[in-house]
């Protein structure tokens, strides 16, 4: 006969986040001793961490604190929308914001309550039974930073996050943040694109134009046209504005009295 009650199982679940069957087994193994049951679950969880490490963690959330943004991953949206997971991620984001961390390595080496984030993540992973990951972090410089977090559905946490540093009008910066979230710009200006990427696009444009049998004399003009199309797709300030497709993002921002000085976009799993 079991020497524990349903209330004991419930208390153990709430304290550890482990599943009901795991909690029952822990209480069985510990003969109803609560503290030993907690220890059993911690050991069991630690043993399973290496197995979880081989799995993919492509769900999760984006969180922002101050000028710092982090991505925390899990395996399923079931865990992603769990309040305990969201609270856990928020705690990491707050610590990252205070320390102004700027990489995944810095994030995982950051200490919270005397433990590295990587250790805290492993402990939380043991509770959830899923692989968890503090994947990356970035801090954007600037006195004025607009933040936008996008939820794909009302019951899920933000899956896309944008930070925009700017000067001038805040509403204009917010509109640009929405643009970045939706259109996934990669660079602020064309000058920010690495030369090797531009050269590769030029080579592709030339090869495509020749494959189409266009006259050699027309080649330079056609290639430049295709390169301009590439710029309009990846350069934020050259994209067509979502609020007025006849104008570029730069034109609309200028009219609003906003100057964009930098941005970062995160998307869960991307």
From Swiss-Prot:
GO terms for cellular component: cytoplasm. PROSITE patterns: EF_TS_1, EF_TS_2. GO terms for molecular function: translation elongation factor activity. Keywords: Cytoplasm, Elongation factor, Protein biosynthesis. Coiled coil: none annotated. Transmembrane segments: none annotated. CDD domains: UBA_EF-Ts (cd14275). Residues 76-79 are annotated as: Involved in Mg(2+) ion dislocation from EF-Tu. It is found in: Cytoplasm. The keyword Cytoplasm applies. Signal peptide: none annotated. The keyword DNA repair does not apply. Belongs to the EF-Ts family. Associates with the EF-Tu.GDP complex and induces the exchange of GDP to GTP. It remains bound to the aminoacyl-tRNA.EF-Tu.GTP complex up to the GTP hydrolysis stage on the ribosome. This is Elongation factor Ts. It comes from Corynebacterium aurimucosum (strain ATCC 700975 / DSM 44827 / CIP 107346 / CN-1) (Corynebacterium nigricans).
């Amino acid at each position: 006969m079991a020497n524990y009650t349903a209330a004991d199982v419930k208390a153990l679940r709430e304290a550890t986040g482990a599943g009901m069957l795991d909690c029952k087994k822990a209480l069985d193994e510990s003969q109803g001793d609560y503290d030993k049951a907690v220890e059993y679950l911690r050991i069991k969880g630690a043993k399973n961490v290496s197995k979880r490490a081989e799995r993919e963690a492509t769900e999760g959330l984006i969180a922002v604190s101050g000028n710092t943004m982090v991505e925390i991953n899990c395996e399923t949206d079931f865990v992603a929308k769990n309040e305990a997971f969201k609270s856990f991620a928020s705690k990491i984001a707050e610590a990252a914001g205070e320390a102004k961390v700027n990489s995944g390595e810095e994030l995982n080496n950051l200490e919270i309550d005397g433990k590295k984030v990587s250790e805290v993540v492993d402990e939380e992973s043991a509770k959830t039974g899923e692989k968890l990951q503090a994947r990356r972090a970035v801090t954007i410089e600037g006195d004025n930073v607009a933040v936008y977090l996008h939820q794909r559905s009302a019951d899920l946490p933000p899956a896309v996050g944008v930070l925009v540093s700017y000067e001038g009008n805040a509403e204009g910066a917010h509109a640009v943040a929405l643009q970045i979230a939706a259109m996934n710009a990669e660079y602020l200006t064309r000058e920010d694109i690495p030369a090797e990427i531009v050269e590769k696009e030029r080579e592709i444009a030339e090869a495509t134009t020749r494959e189409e049998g266009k006259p050699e004399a027309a080649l330079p003009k056609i290639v430049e046209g295709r390169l301009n199309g590439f710029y309009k797709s990846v350069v934020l300030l050259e994209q067509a504005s979502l609020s007025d497709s006849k104008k570029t993002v730069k034109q609309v921002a200028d009219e609003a009295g906003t100057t964009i000085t930098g941005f970062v976009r995160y998307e869960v799993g991307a």
